[in-house]
């Protein structure tokens, strides 16, 4: 119990307490291993215009994220981030951001994001998962579930191997990339809210988020990957509508440098 309490941390974006039993450096090593293995087999899109769109929006979201953390004295949270933006030739409606800022977008989701604003909804959301250390939190929860509190201390003494093994499960980078251990409702709410903040600070219109998630919900069986681990459509859209008025203060013209 003392070990678990000592490992409690606070989400830098929202102040929520979270349990982190895996160090940032260890998580980064494990996630980069999974990412590099995936990118060796993934087929990058040959569509120059679409690729440029992903890079363009991704860079603006990344810059806004960095600015938000700088303004709030949390620059250290991104010290190991090296942003990369990839568009993969795959018809799935999916995207993800690995720890360290490795962003992957599937061509399929561009069908649902016709404008840069729409794509910013997706990328803002996924970046939050990485910055808020949601993957670390899931891995920590799995360590507790796998080993139990009684032998957790002994397990952690050998957790390099355990971390690599859990990374394969948590990140799920393979034929079903993105179908990972589901983020909790808390994680999704954080990603939805802070994703809106980041995209707004980047100069995008957060109001399009409602339309994007409505299109996702109308996709039915064709979009199970992203929706399967997220809250119900009605719950998400209702929450986003509640968040939108607050986004006004994050618009670039309203922020003080």
Q: Where are the regions that the model predicts?
A:
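A Zn2+-metalloprotease active-site environment signal
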Residues: 8-257
């Amino acid at each position: 119990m003392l070990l678990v309490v000592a490992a409690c941390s606070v989400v830098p974006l929202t102040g929520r307490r979270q349990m982190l039993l895996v160090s940032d450096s260890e998580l980064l090593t494990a996630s980069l291993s999974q990412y590099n293995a995936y990118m060796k087999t993934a087929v990058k899109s040959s569509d120059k215009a679409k690729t440029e769109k992903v890079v363009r929006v991704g860079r603006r979201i990344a810059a806004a994220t960095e600015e938000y953390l700088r303004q709030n004295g949390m620059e250290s949270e991104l010290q190991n981030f090296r942003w990369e933006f990839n568009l993969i030739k795959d018809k799935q409606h999916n995207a993800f951001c690995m720890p360290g800022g490795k962003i992957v977008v599937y061509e399929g989701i561009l069908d649902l994001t016709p404008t840069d604003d729409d794509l910013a909804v997706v990328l803002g959301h996924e970046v939050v998962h990485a910055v808020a250390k949601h993957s670390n939190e899931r891995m920590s929860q799995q360590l507790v579930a796998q080993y139990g509190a009684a032998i957790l201390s002994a397990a952690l003494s050998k957790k390099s191997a355990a971390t690599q093994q859990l990374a394969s499960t948590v990140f799920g980078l393979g034929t079903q990339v993105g179908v990972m251990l589901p983020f909790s409702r808390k994680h999704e709410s954080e990603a939805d809210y802070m994703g809106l903040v980041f995209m707004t600070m980047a100069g995008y219109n957060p109001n399009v988020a409602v339309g994007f998630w409505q299109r996702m919900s109308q996709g039915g069986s064709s979009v199970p990957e992203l929706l399967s681990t997220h809250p119900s459509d009605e719950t998400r859209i209702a929450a986003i509508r509640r968040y939108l008025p607050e986004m006004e203060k994050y618009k670039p013209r309203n922020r003080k440098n």
